[in-house]
């Protein structure tokens, strides 16, 4: 009974095109379709669940800046899907390593978005979380930066103060 009233007062909009009725419409779903992507970046093997796109950006910002639980769930589902596809020798030794947000950003948002998502993914997959990463220096707001500027912005910004796993 309350659900139809809630939908009338607070309609769901597609994160991609803003169409009313569903969090991600079939047209925009092709830009948010969890897969298992594997690439090498500067000698580091990177596994990812989603290719970056305007739809992905909207979902990430919806979770990060607006605390939309629907966006959180889309991100968690994509990450869980990717982790479950990892080869057994890799997933057996995998850990989740959340990148910390600044105290100011966490205070402004009212939550530590990355840590909350990491906890949920850990719970669903049984992959442990390793903490100990700290912010060493202040960072610029990443939202308006290019890929090159983002890389420059985070270079040397984090430090690990935990035990290393062999």
Segments (PLM) and residue ranges:
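Glycine-rich phosphate/pyrophosphate-handling loop used in enzymes and phosphotransfer proteins
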Residues: 1-166
